[in-house]
Amino acid sequence: VRRLGEVRNGRRQLGAISLDKFIILVTAERSARVKEPTGRIVLRGASPSTRLQPPDLMQFTIGAVREAESHDMQHMHVTLAPSDSARWTTVPMPANLQMLPAEMTLRPAVAPYLPRGDSSLPRARPRELIRLTNGDTLRLRAGLVHRAFKGQTLTMFAFNDQYPGPLLHVPQGAEITVELTNALDQPTTIHWQGVRLDNRFDGTPDLTQQPMPPGGRFIYHLRFPDAGIYWYHPHVREDVQQELGLYGNMLVRSPRADYFSPAHREEILMLDDLLVNDDGLVPFGADAATHALMGRFGNVLLVNGEPRYSLLVKSGEVVRLYFTNVSNTRTFNLSFPGARMKIVAGDVGNFEREEWVESIVIAPAERYVVHVKFDRAGDVALPNRVQALDHLYGRFYYERDTLGIVHVEAARADGNLEASFAR
């Protein structure tokens, strides 16, 4: 019990309460000097988190479940061909979480799906930078690839056999043409996240265009009126197509030299997670998505499609980092402990005033741009630190995952940017 003080007329500021759950009691006492409250409780208040309660254990023990609810929560309902080799298994669980045995036996009510491919499929390769100018044409192909991942060979999707898809650099105001060929076994489109464009080319199936069938082709005409960081991905069965690798970044350059404060270099990072087990990818639902509302969390965190990101910088270097969260449902909370960081831009472009921050919270589809200065030699981690939730016991717990390491050399960076960075 923590005493907060005497209640008087007017408003009393308590300050931050750093507790996961709390209840506030106001009691009527004979004197404000009492050490232990004994009077009648006249007011009771509680944090919203106190409403978090464990489920009815008896319900799960006997294996009772509700009927399957509607899965039509994605942009387009597409039934995929079930995979002969795919099977439902127990989903990997974090080491510090438990599920009841009856709950662990539950399986989705739809057939499992995984993409199928033979040995002739190309190997996925890292993304390439494509610099486009006004009037250029970009040709993209959505197809299947083989990908080496943590000692396994996975069949996944890719634009132009690249994972992530090609990184596009475009000058502000440019107009380009994109020809998309669908080499998948299912319909698809491309949505250009955040770009103000002609509605006909927004990529929303059955609203702004008809989805491209397998073997089909569609031509997008795009104009980029705003500088900033954007990304592209399908709007058909995102739970499958985006999760399997159909995404890429677009960096639209401003003609202004002072659009951002100075930095020594830029890094463009796409954040994702992937759900895998000992057999490879955990299957998706063939008839419908198997995860709704909270979505499908992965158990391996990725930066630019790979676990354990690594970057080599010099002491004193200022790095401009463009972050894009392409995961289905995970919100990231990123920081660089021991390095100074300020946020300079977001989804809609640069900020009028840069702000110092300890971390940045990035929800799915969001983008942020930060400047980080690495002052001292050594290793700086890039952790994701969140307050996670144990639904079984109704409790919060701390979770920390390291996405990568920045290795800072003792050699000093050319050009001291401390004056402009410190403003």
Q: What kind of region is each of these model predictions?
A:
Residues 9-18, 219-222, 369-372:
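Exposed aromatic-hydrophobic patches
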Residues 20-24, 176, 228-230, 319, ...:
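Exposed beta-strand face motif in extracellular beta-rich ectodomains
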Residues 69-139, 242-276, 352-423:
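Extended terminal and domain-junction accessory segments
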Residues 149-163, 279-297:
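Short, polar loop/linker segments at the starts of domains and inter-domain junctions
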Residues 2-72:
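N-terminal targeting/export leaders
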Residues 128-129, 164-169, 307-312:
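Short beta-strand segments of immunoglobulin-like
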Residues 200-213, 286-422:
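Histidine- and aromatic-rich segments of cupredoxin/plastocyanin-like copper-binding domains
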